Swiss-Prot record:
It is an enzyme of class 6 (ligase). Homodimer. ATP binds at residue 336. Residues 575-677 form the tRNA-binding domain. A motif ('KMSKS' region) lies at residues 333-337. CDD domains: Anticodon_Ia_Met, MetRS_core, tRNA_bind_EcMetRS_like. GO terms for cellular component: cytosol. Pfam families: Anticodon_3 (PF19303), tRNA-synt_1g (PF09334), tRNA_bind (PF01588). This is Methionine--tRNA ligase.
């Protein structure tokens, strides 16, 4: 029976927009999607959203290395991420970006409310500064040894080993990621969120019983060690949102990242023309349910900072956090050298999405345990469960129904009590899906599959088919088998969306949770076609080799204008002002005898002639083509005596050299002698 419909908003942690989705990411998105699909099957109103986490130092730095803008990079990465999630049938209602108008407005609103309510504090801090690059070093520009667990090579904001958060100044033996230099201390005014003011509220939330026991225990440790004010600002240069009325100061990425959940939902509401749901879901007294699926490495931000920010800005808090562990492959951390660091897109070139969805689901529980993807066990389990137990149940019976009875099922069940055993299991299996005890749900379903196959073995329709006068028995047995198959696939529909579509096409009926109470009787099914193919270790071997090759390709040096020719050391405006750039008309251009690189240019600066030797011959093999063209030259460069004569300046050109040299030209209207500023 359909439950009372609930309004539910579900999110996954926002993937960072500087890298590809891999199988570690997919655990969370598959877990959330299975849960969401189950909720939808039970008639609930579910909004399932996500976005790219698109701000911060790593994105700015990588874009610089690639020679593109951060906006261009995050745009390309968003398309890649969405393609990967669609390939795994992750049923998002909206996928957005934290670099959006909605997120900017909401970040500024929350910050303003926190400030007005007295939860933002200003103070001057000593901050690490790169003396070689002349810039303050945000968290991700600094690496060193964690001050808590002493793990080496950790970033300046949190430790990926023990999960601790800290300030960059607490790192042991810090180094600048940009230059490798040892940073020095400089003062800078920063903005802090007064997290300790919310300690009582957070402790009450922890004791409410909603959080996983492991999460609540970890939070208690943090309370006992004392909550600290949280630095929410970063100095320029930084890719993100500038803090209102604070030029050169930006919101730290972890302030606007969780607000991205709200921004993505706001964007979805706007797309729908829905003017009420955003407030209905996010208001302080909302009766909608809000769930965040996250990894155990970001519990600190989601269990402390995020609910405190929401409370302090008069929004509702999450109903619960659903936290999962990490993914290992073949019992070890994912390894690029071993080919077990596998991208989502690479997986889909060798296996279907349903296979990984099933394997992860079979291993997941409501606890925060790590999941091991054992590739040999993966092949065995998919073949044993999906192919041998479930799909085989249909194939063993469908042929007889199609050939002997024109696809029409029997008018009555052969064993109503057995069918009731299967439908009665809906309560236990449904509760397992609801409580995220996915492994238990799969075990219950496979136990039923064993019973169904045992029924077919005992009834032996292949024997009955050869016996005269037993057509009715044959139809009843095979119809019973197909009806049991239908119940099993209804229970598995949240896990196996692609297979479920094929099954629905064969059954000529939708797999609906509430409909299983009524078996398909006297119903016509379609011609049976192969539903799922066996997999083998050769596919695994090809997958691993492909992953190794991708790692080799990724390890190749980054190329591009900025990567090949890094920006030079910073100069002052006074230094730049010493350079006198002028528009020059090329009156004559000719080869230089004795040189295969130089052209001799005669330049008119509007009343003054200059003779310039320029190494652009390989790019301009016909000097005459340059005559009459305007360019830009350094007019106050000291004359340089060469064996061909004296060069009285330098023309400006772009490019790496050789044939790739591009002489600069001013727009039409510029006149010889005009200064370039």
């Amino acid at each position: 029976m359909t439950q009372v419909a609930k309004k539910i908003l579900v999110t996954c942690a926002l993937p960072y927009a500087n890298g590809s989705i891999h199988l570690g990411h997919m655990l969370e998105h598959i877990q959330a999607d299975v849960w969401v699909r189950y909720q939808r099957m039970r008639g609930h109103e579910v909004n399932f959203i996500c976005a790219d986490d698109a701000h911060g130092t790593p994105i700015m730095l990588k874009a610089q290395q690639l020679g593109i803008t951060p906006e261009q990079m995050i745009g390309e990465m968003s398309q890649e991420h969405q393609t990967d999630f669609a390939g795994f049938n992750i049923s998002y209602d909206n996928y957005h970006s934290t670099h959006s108008d909605e997120n900017r407005e909401l970040s500024e609103l929350i910050y303003t409310r926190l400030k007005e309510n007295g939860f933002i504090k200003n103070r001057t801090i000593s901050q690490l500064y790169d003396p070689e690059k002349g810039m303050f070093l945000p968290d991700r520009f600094v690496k060193g040894t964690c001050p808590k667990c002493k793990s080496a090579d950790q970033y300046g904001d949190n430790c990926e080993v023990c999960g601790a958060t800290y300030s960059p100044t607490e790192l042991i033996e810090p180094k600048s990621v940009v230059s490798g230099a040892t940073p020095v201390m400089r003062d800078s005014e920063h903005f802090f969120f007064d997290l300790p003011s919310f300690s009582e509220m957070l402790q009450a939330w922890t004791r409410s019983g909603a959080l996983q026991e492991q999460v609540a225990n970890k939070m208690q440790e943090w309370f006992e060690s004392g909550l600290q004010q949280w630095d929410i600002s970063r100095d320029a240069p930084y890719f993100g949102f500038e803090i209102p009325n604070a030029p050169g100061k930006y919101f730290y990425v972890w302030l606007d990242a969780p607000i991205g959940y709200m921004g993505s939902f706001k964007n979805l509401c706007d797309k729908r023309g829905d003017t009420t749901s955003f407030d209905e879901y996010w208001k302080k007294d909302s009766d909608a349910e809000l769930y965040h699926f996250i990894g155990k490495d970001i519990v600190y931000f989601h269990s402390l900072f995020w609910p405190a920010m929401l409370e302090g800005s008069h929004f509702r808090k999450p109903t619960n956090l659903f936290v999962h562990g990490y993914v290992t492959v073949n019992g070890a951390k994912m390894s690029k050298s071993r080919g077990t660091f596998i991208k989502a897109s690479t997986w889909l070139k060798h296996f279907d999405a349903d296979s990984l969805r099933y394997y992860y689901t079979a291993k997941l529980s409501s606890r925060i345990d790590d999941i091991d993807l054992n590739l040999e066990d993966f092949v065995q389990r998919v073949n044993a469960d999906i192919v041998n137990k479930v799909v085989n149940l249909a194939s063993r019976n469908a042929g007889f129904i199609n050939k002997r009875f024109d696809g029409v099922l029997a008018a009555e069940l052969a064993d109503p009590q057995l069918y009731k055993t299967f439908t009665d299991a809906a309560a236990v299996i449904g509760e397992a899906w609801e409580s995220r005890e996915f492994g238990k749900a799969i075990r219950e379903i496979m136990a039923l599959a064993d019973i169904a196959n045992r029924y077919v073995d005992e009834q032996a329709p292949w024997v009955v088919a050869k016996q005269e006068g037993r057509d009715a028995d044959l139809q009843a047995i095979c119809s019973m088998g197909i009806n049991l198959f239908r119940v099993l696939m209804t229970y598995l529909k949240p896990v196996l969306p692609t297979l479920s579509e094929r099954v629905e096409a064969f059954l000529n009926s939708e797999l609906n949770w509430d409909a299983i109470e009524q078996p398909l009787l006297g119903h016509k099914v379609n011609t049976f076609k192969a539903l799922y193919n066996r997999i083998d270790m050769k596919q695994v071997e090809a997958l691993v080799e492909a992953s190794k090759e991708e790692v080799k390709a990724a390890a190749a040096p980054v190329t591009g204008p900025l990567a090949d020719f890094p920006i030079q050391e910073t100069i002052t405006f006074d230094d730049f002002a010493k350079i006198d750039l002028r528009v020059a008309l090329i009156e004559n251009a000719e080869f230089v005898d004795g040189s295969d690189k130089l052209l001799r240019l005669t330049l008119d600066l509007g009343g003054e002639k200059r003779n310039v030797f320029s190494g652009i011959r390989s790019a301009y093999p016909d000097p005459q083509a340059l005559i009459g063209r305007q360019t830009v030259m350094v007019a106050n460069l000291a004359p340089r005596k060469m064996r061909f004569g004296v060069s009285e300046g330098m023309v400006m050109a772009a490019g790496p050299g050789g044939k790739d040299i591009f002489l600069l030209s001013p727009d039409d209207g510029a006149k010889p002698g005009q200064q370039v500023k």
